[in-house]
């Protein structure tokens, strides 16, 4: 084994996957990184095989998808793997972000790791939207029309930008070609960012549930955490297989099986479940331009999170106020997901507006307030102890 470590690639693999020192107390919430890497590999491989048979043409895109499902050997399996894999990727991504929020993984010295991760999150949302439009079904066509039309809210140049995106005066053949090219390219950029994310992580090491620097109590990644990762990966494949073989369309819309009809608007235009919270934020603001700004800021605000949290204690494990606010935020995020799937009518509009206000208030107001209260109490306690002594 020592001789093999002389090879640069083997040595690199050994440093990152075998001998990497990890805190001895991390739990299963730290397994989502390996799960995300697994699902990303599935998405790239299944996407490459789908691209071999998909035709990015307005009149042929839907037919090519049907050809994959009906005539390509195991084409149905590849497509369902790709569609279901997208849902799993976002589920793991949201859980990964939630773990980072709860345990303060965005704090120094891991700010760069968090920043790269947020960039991955944004590109993943963009990639998912582009893939959503490619089947050219009734929902994907009108979804592409509505979302790309949001660019027209930009003053002076909005309408020109929309026509530039479309390559014409509506969603057409040029649009599908552009979206297909970008959808094929972006996963490789995400993979490169994921490697950068891992390099930045290993520079300072993983965080831990206690929120303290655990350099004095670390153990090698193999076999301890390597086996632990494999356990959750095997569990994922079991659940993944059950959904693919028994409930492959459980998360899809019925209009996805209908070809695009530019002359007929569907009853409701609803994106995939993992985009619903941001869709709800978009719809909660009547003004088109401000709605678009709010939707993008809901993602980009994660970049500023390290600046908004100035608490002496990293994470919420030992902070009752921070813990309560965190679970309120999670409940609010699930509520936004629910509201995004509903029609624009009373009482969903009002609920969506209040949920959107709380979403931004959590980052801009409640996190700094929680930090201020916690720091004040710690300072008062320290002063009282010094006086007592």
Swiss-Prot record:
Its cofactor is heme b. Belongs to the cytochrome b family. Its main location: mitochondrion. Coiled coil: none annotated. It comes from Schizosaccharomyces japonicus (Fission yeast). Keywords: Electron transport, Heme, Iron, Membrane, Metal-binding, Mitochondrion, Mitochondrion inner membrane, Respiratory chain, Transmembrane, Transmembrane helix, Transport, Ubiquinone. The gene is cob. Component of the ubiquinol-cytochrome c reductase complex (complex III or cytochrome b-c1 complex) that is part of the mitochondrial respiratory chain. The b-c1 complex mediates electron transfer from ubiquinol to cytochrome c. Contributes to the generation of a proton gradient across the mitochondrial membrane that is then used for ATP synthesis. Heme 1 (or BL or b562) is low-potential and absorbs at about 562 nm, and heme 2 (or BH or b566) is high-potential and absorbs at about 566 nm. Binds 2 heme b groups non-covalently. PANTHER family: CYTOCHROME B. It is found in: Mitochondrion inner membrane. One of its GO terms (molecular function) is ubiquinol-cytochrome-c reductase activity. Fungal cytochrome b-c1 complex contains 10 subunits; 3 respiratory subunits, 2 core proteins and 5 low-molecular weight proteins. Cytochrome b-c1 complex is a homodimer. The keyword Isomerase does not apply. GO terms for cellular component: mitochondrial inner membrane; respiratory chain complex III. It comes from the Eukaryota. Heme b b566 binds at residues 96, 197. Heme b b562 binds at residues 82, 183. This is Cytochrome b. The chain crosses the membrane at residues 32-52, 76-98, 113-133, 179-199, 225-245, 289-309, 321-341, 348-368. A ubiquinone binds at residue 202. GO terms for biological process: mitochondrial electron transport, ubiquinol to cytochrome c.
